[in-house]
Amino acid sequence: MLRARHPFFDGKLLNVKSAHDRDALFAFYYKCVIISYISIFVSVLGETGCGPVPCVSPRKLPGRKDVAFIKAKHGKGAAQSGRHSHSGSCAQRATPLWKQVLLTLLIFIALLALLGGALWQNICYNRTHYTAEFYQIHSRKLTQSCRVVFLTDVHLREYGQDNCELVQDIRRLAPDLILLGGDLVTYGEGSSYDNMLSLCSQLSQIAPVCGVLGNHEDELYFLDGDQALVEKFTAAGVTILRNQEARYTIHDNVISILGVEGSPKNFYNYGASAFMDAVETQTDYDLRICLAHIPTYFTEHLENYSFELGLAGHTHGGIVRLPKVGPLYTAEEGFLPDYAGGSYALANSATLIVSRGLGDSSRVPRINNVPELSVIDID
């Protein structure tokens, strides 16, 4: 596993996995691929006779007396063939058809192996590494800057025993507040509770931690009837917001955190609409952050309310991200989604950050899509 020192804007050097190291590793691998392919191509040119062939050194042509002697002894045709057989022209070697087919097949197999190896290397890298993505947000009222670490969709993945590597990196980031975007557990896998509780307990020793439930926790809570789920989070030091607000005073600034529950289609059915209407009139805070697990919640409903920063996850970055195209698919938006990872401007002038998340999918592996730990610096 690569561990890199990554420079931050404040001059600190921290031991985290960075996009720079990922790009350097991929660049080295692809250079090896290109060199290998060029070597195969050059060797094939030599085998098929497409390259230069050594010329036969010209010999002295027979004179008239020699020609007459050859005609008298062997006939006219022999003299002509003898003359042309010693010409200085270069002959091309003919390659049998079976050899051409074999070489073409070898090239195809080699190219397929190289592409397959690159894909497998990409998948393996994404299973063991993550990148710290940094975002800079300007606030109108904050008197002193603060740092927020946002992590979401950690299920089906563990970074070191009990996520010790992830916790160590977060500790070195020195956040003022840690926010969770949901899906820390996997529906149907009760054994993942231990990892979730251990991670939350360790995070709560670094900074205040609060967050929302994801769709996996909702299924555990509503479908399996695990009414003690929120209590388990609370016991681990995490405040779970279910259409609720939490406030923190950081560097003499009051930060309001809104946590909206459920999915966009349930906005009017389970109290989210009434909750947002109730807190809309508040003004006694310096910064307001809104949390929702699903990013389309913001574009469909939440951008009609007042806050400066929105945070969401759920999409896993689209799972597969194509070069020059972006995320391939999400359940809410279908193919080529608009909100699957990155920062976006909302209609209320707020910034929406959609994290690619830290976890994995049980069906399709991440391809060209490194997991993300989001670091937001607000000034």
What are the roles of these predicted feature ranges?
Residues 63-64, 68-142:
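N-terminal membrane-anchoring alpha-helices
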Residues 29-43, 54, 69-71:
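Short, positively charged and aromatic/hydrophobic N-terminal segments
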Residues 134-149, 238, 245-258, 283-287, ...:
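Beta-strand-turn-beta hairpins that frame and shape the catalytic cleft
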Residues 224-238, 250-292, 298-300, 363-366:
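Binuclear metal-dependent hydrolase catalytic cores centered on His/Asp/Glu-rich metal-binding motifs
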Residues 145-231, 235-239:
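Membrane-embedded segments
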Residues 151-152, 178-183, 209-215, 241-243, ...:
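Active-site neighborhood of phospho(di)ester-bond hydrolases with catalytic His/Asp-centered motifs
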